[in-house]
A protein has these predicted regions:
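Generic hydrophobic, aliphatic-rich segments that mediate packing or membrane embedding
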Residues: 75-78, 82, 103, 117, ...
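Short, amphipathic alpha-helical "recognition" segments used to contact nucleic acids or chromatin
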Residues: 101-114
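Short, well-ordered secondary-structure "scaffold" segments embedded in the functional core
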Residues: 117-120, 124-393
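Short alpha-helical segments in extracytoplasmic peptidoglycan/chitin-binding modules
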Residues: 75, 107, 121
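Short, flexible loop/turn motifs enriched in small residues
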Residues: 76, 101-102, 202-207
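Charged, often Cys/His-bearing segments associated with DNA-binding zinc-finger transcription factors
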Residues: 1-93, 147-148, 153, 347, ...
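An N-terminal domain-cap segment
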Residues: 89-99, 188, 192-193
Length: 393
């Protein structure tokens, strides 16, 4: 019943004006009667509920599965599962008369899925704009605190499956994860010591999303709190993954490696492309092509994430912390319902061009172990290519 009520209000503007006025009139009458504490007979209550149910059912019958998913990004069954998981949380906003967990979840999903102004979203749910904003913050807090394990680093069987997946689809051995980045706009943050470090070259404020993905594009670690202006190598160093790479890379990777672009430092645990000096041999070109194919997995997931949850393009929050929670919430939902978003994308570019790490003032060409490992993998790709040519000649 709650789901039907929410959808009826949300889609009111999709129907005739008379239908909208009917919904609004009924809602106003109900609130007035509650305030005046009018007593009604049980039979009258049942009759009104039956009338509402008929109206809501009529609306639902016209709402296809694809229509529901286009509005909320999840299917009805996935939404029901999300409501079930978040129902035990102590929601502040559902104290309002007639407001349920269903309303809270659907309102938050709608807000995250569109760039529609907050006041417009509030009008759909017949509540205030401030309540929508508070509700969205609450939703993100509950999702990230109760469902955080949906984003986790692969170990054991999961790690082996990712390695096998990258080998079969891309052709690079021992690859555990790939990393991609993009930027998330924010308002001038008020919860950081120096907000100006978050101002980019265009005069806007933004943070960098750095996301690690497995072979399926599932997020295994995300960071969304550092300034966009920071070089990728600096952001990596400040993340938990970067710290683990410095302190105990064996425990993190178990002999495997991460793939990143040329903005990251090369090591035996973190492989990058060969610098393109226009003199690369066939083996190195082949290696670089496979690296680019693997990086497309992460950038594809990021692109799809921002396409599905368009609010990430205009969160309009003055808090880095709240922005980070919203980003992580969208990544968690992406992981939970991966099959919903597993679609091909055309645009898989990075957010901004940065200098390769080895061209930075403090950069270097890579550790000896990284240089050697990259050479060995490229050489093995060359041998495989020659072997295949021989077999089919």
């Amino acid at each position: 019943m709650a789901l039907q009520t929410c959808i009826a209000f949300l889609l009111a503007d999709s129907y005739d004006v008379e239908d909208f006025l009917f919904f609004k009139k009924n809602a106003t009458r109900k609130r007035r009667k509650v305030r005046m504490k009018l007593k009604t007979e049980p039979s009258d209550d049942l009759q009104r509920e039956d009338e509402k149910r008929d109206i809501f059912n009529a609306v639902l019958q016209s709402l296809t599965i694809s229509d529901f998913k286009s509005h909320f990004q999840l299917t009805t069954s996935q939404t029901e599962e999300l409501v079930r998981l978040l129902a035990p949380c102590k929601w502040t906003a559902i104290r309002q008369e007639g407001w349920t967990v269903w309303h809270a979840v659907l309102a938050s999903l709608w807000a995250l899925s569109t760039q529609e102004a907050y006041h417009s979203v509030a009008n759909r749910f017949h509540i205030t704009e401030s309540l929508i904003c508070v509700q969205l913050d609450e939703f993100c807090t509950f999702v990230t605190s109760n469902l955080a394990n949906e984003i986790h680093w692969p170990h054991g069987e999961e790690a082996e499956m990712s390695v096998v997946g990258f080998l079969s689809t891309v052709g690079l051995p021992d690859t555990l994860c790939v990393v991609g980045t993009c930027f998330i706009p924010v308002e001038k943050p008020t919860d950081v010591p120096d907000p100006e470090v978050y101002r980019d070259t265009e005069g806007s404020y933004s943070i960098k999303l750095m996301a690690f993905c497995n072979h399926k594009g599932r997020f295994t670690y995300v960071s969304a709190e550092h300034p966009r202006n920071w070089h990728n190598s600096r952001v990596l160093s400040a993340t938990e993954v970067g710290k683990a790479l410095r302190e105990n890379p064996v425990a993190l990777l178990h002999g495997k490696h991460i793939i990143g672009n040329s903005t990251f430092p090369l090591s035996e645990h973190f492989l990058t492309p060969f610098p393109d000096y226009a003199t690369l041999g066939q083996k190195k070109v082949c290696y670089n092509q496979k690296v680019q194919s693997s990086l497309a997995v992460a950038q594809g997931s990021i692109h799809t994430l921002r396409s599905c949850f368009q609010r990430l393009r205009c969160l309009q929050k003055h808090s880095v912390c709240q922005t980070s929670l919203a980003v992580k919430t969208c990544c968690i939902l992406y992981n939970m319902f991966l099959e919903t978003y597993n679609v091909l994308v055309d645009c898989i570019g990075d957010d901004v061009t940065q200098k390769p790490f080895h061209e930075l003032r403090y950069g270097h060409s890579g550790s000896l172990g990284g240089i050697s490992k990259r050479q060995d993998i490229a050489a093995s790709l060359g041998r495989t290519t020659k072997k295949r040519k021989y077999m089919y000649s």
